[in-house]
Amino acid sequence: MLETTQALFHLGPLAVGTTVVTTWGIMVVLSLGAWLASRRLRLDPGPFQVALEGVVQTIRAAVEEVVPRRADTVFPFVATLWLFIGIANLSSLIPRVHSPTADLSATTALALLVFFSVHWFGIRIQGLRPYLRHYLSPSPFLLPFHVIGEITRTLALAVRLFGNMMSLETAALLVLLVAGLFAPIPLLMLHIVEALVQAYIFGMLTLVYIAGAIQSLEARRSPKEEET
């Protein structure tokens, strides 16, 4: 587990470790895969296109269920986050590759990305003053509690994903040491399920936080506005 923090090479004074390399590798794979998958879309899709469309439609349905009026705005960010974390969690299945999400620095970066994105969506959709005003409701005395809540949920996002993925890798290593060749297949299935579940939880929490940032505007919409 310590290998995730070891430096592979240096760029000037900056040490580049396995977490950074794996993270950039996953981003390249996702970008290249998205480009290749969208080059030759057909009305009569093959198995690969059907699978991709199924993934996209599933994520889209989840987003529409939480923020139906703002699905077009929120979907690209949440879908990208879901796919990245899912692939990152599964990357440890590759021999000698450690999942970036088993490194606290990576999960902290993801949590900070969510933190700033939530506020960005809130300000973009509501406007700066209306968005900031909701921190003073129902009483200005609750402002410190709102601020503490924002900080603690960001920390919880980072620590939850890191702790679960680190414990998953540690448990897998211990089982392999004890059970040897009898463990790989059940362990592989457990790893896949847990990796996807953790990605789902992180993405769903992000979606709920974004919905919370824009809900005051949605609540002010009249029935007539909803029809239009």
Curated annotation (Swiss-Prot):
SUPFAM superfamilies registered for this protein in UniProt: F1F0 ATP synthase subunit A
GO cellular component term of the entry, any: plasma membrane
Chief place where the protein resides: membrane
Gene3D superfamilies: ATP synthase, F0 complex, subunit A
Statement: the UniProt record of this protein carries the keyword Ion transport: yes
Cytoplasm in keyword set: no
Subcellular location: Cell inner membrane
BP-aspect Gene Ontology terms: proton motive force-driven plasma membrane ATP synthesis
Membrane topology: Multi-pass membrane protein
Keywords on record: ATP synthesis, Cell inner membrane, Cell membrane, CF(0), Hydrogen ion transport, Ion transport, Membrane, Transmembrane, Transmembrane helix, Transport
GO molecular function: proton-transporting ATP synthase activity, rotational mechanism
Transmembrane regions listed in the UniProt entry: 16-36, 74-94, 103-123, 139-159, 173-193, 194-214
UniProt-listed PANTHER family: ATP SYNTHASE SUBUNIT A, CHLOROPLASTIC
Job of this protein: Key component of the proton channel; it plays a direct role in the translocation of protons across the membrane.
Family, similarity comment: Belongs to the ATPase A chain family.
Subunit details: F-type ATPases have 2 components, CF(1) - the catalytic core - and CF(0) - the membrane proton channel. CF(1) has five subunits: alpha(3), beta(3), gamma(1), delta(1), epsilon(1). CF(0) has three main subunits: a(1), b(2) and c(9-12). The alpha and beta chains form an alternating ring which encloses part of the gamma chain. CF(1) is attached to CF(0) by a central stalk formed by the gamma and epsilon chains, while a peripheral stalk is formed by the delta and b chains.
Protein name: ATP synthase subunit a 2
